[in-house]
Amino acid sequence: MKEYQVYLERARSRQQDFLYPLIFREYIYGLAYSHNWNRSIFVENGGYDDKYSLLNVKRLITRMYQQNHLIISTNDSNKNPFWGYNKNFYSQTISEGFAIVVEIPFFLQLSSSLEEAEIIKSYKNVRSIHSIFPFLEDKFTYLNYVSDIRIPYPIHLEILVQILRYWVKDAPFFHLLRLFLYHFSNWNRFITTKKSISTFSKSNPRLFLFLYNFYVCEYESIFLFLRNKSSHLRLKSFSVFLERIFFYAKREHLVEVFAKDFSYPLPFFKDPNIHYVRYQGKCILASKNVPFLMNKWKHYFIHLWQCFFDVWSQPRTININQLSEHSFQLLGYFSNVRLNRSVVRSQMLQNTFLIEIVSKKLDIIVPIIPLIRSLAKAKFCNVLGHPISKPVWADSSDFDIIERFLRICRNLSHYYNGSSKKKSLYRIKYILRLSCIKTLACKHKSTVRAFLKRSGSEELLEEFFTEEEEILSLIFPRDSFTLHRFYRNRIWYLDILFSNDLVNDE
């Protein structure tokens, strides 16, 4: 954040807060490269190839200076010397530059908003995606109905650019951004298909995620404004998760913009017990009241997307279910509310009564089938969950092979320790353990039994099962009963900023 502020102040002194000149600054690409190199990824540590060097970036910037971007047509893109060579590398490099430049003012706005709201000290804990689950455990046990909503994709990338134009007033920057999107995302089509958007998001993840998250931020801001107009209660629990998208600075602006259009009380049905949670492109809407009110909110969502963002959404794709009978998937977990029934005997004078007590508990379960499917796709097992060797890792040393498998097990245990039932997690770790043994046996051209008997690797491979207990023993007293009780219960970690890579393969 401090690096962003230094670079922005340097640009302000030259161009009075315009973003366009920053595209041609070499240090912007160096900052983008450093950001991605240091970013932690769960399953494997990633990085750029050797082609991404500051020398190549400098040549690219020089070539960009020599081109007249406003007169290049899409038909001439293959003939033009700037676009004609190593198109994928240019696309990735320029998109990183666009993303880092457009993020700078919003990072500064977020920082100032958090300081004004006096929540900067707790902001790091709020950033954890696992902070959502304690909220679910606290609130959802008192609710009755839930709606699992998939936020629709815009049919055209121009919608994302138009939303961004309300906040950034720099015409040359948007001209260059449109030129880039025209050449690298087939934007000359009237409707951008979901497949082409998916391809663009994979090749340019940072830029696409910024544009898409900004679109979701706009929709949530308007939705929260309408929600506040429909109820006299303040949504304290609702604002906790919106702190991550600089909502405090936007709320006052939205009130000014929509005050004229919504000067009278909105004809909404009062629903003070509605709760909303979102991560990535999926949101959960839950309420305690009758399904009729949930159905009203469903239509508000659809009309909001269609009227304000020109995004089409089918009403039949949004279902309303009873929370006790429906499981919803969020952040790689299956969650549902389980009813626990117990009978209590009560005696009054000479009469005895049996009272049935029904309590609710939120079950958060590891989805075993999607995880096995992800492991099969990564070649750790087959589609039935039977472990197989990983021949592509056979060239590494024994220590590196074991360390790779341990890293995956460690990350899965870290991510799924909040599960109500750990049996599925143990099965995943067992698959990875046998896959590791088979990989080592394949490397030494031996059978599994002969390899273990010859090398005596049983003690080393026991780390797959003992490492988690060693970590917990450092936190809790070394009492067997206490450690066993905490090991079976849920443990949420407030330092998880990214979902596991195996979780995203749904």
UniProtKB/Swiss-Prot annotation:
Respond yes or no to whether keyword Ribosomal protein is given for this record.
Answer: no
Extract the InterPro entries matched here. Domain_X, Maturase_MatK, Maturase_MatK_N
Q: What are the protein's UniProt keywords?
A: Chloroplast, mRNA processing, Plastid, RNA-binding, tRNA processing
Annotated Gene Ontology cellular components are: chloroplast
Say yes or no: keyword Plastid present: yes
Subcellular localization: Plastid, Chloroplast
Which superkingdom, per the lineage?
Answer: Eukaryota
> Which BP terms from GO are recorded?
mRNA processing; RNA splicing; tRNA processing
MF GO annotations:
RNA binding
Q: Where would you say this protein principally sits, based on its record?
A: plastid
Q: Name one Pfam family in it.
A: Intron_maturas2
What protein family is recorded? Belongs to the intron maturase 2 family. MatK subfamily.
Summarize the protein's role.
Usually encoded in the trnK tRNA gene intron. Probably assists in splicing its own and other chloroplast group II introns.
Query: What is the protein named?
Result: Maturase K
Q: Which organism is it from?
A: Trifolium hirtum
Q: Which gene encodes it?
A: matK
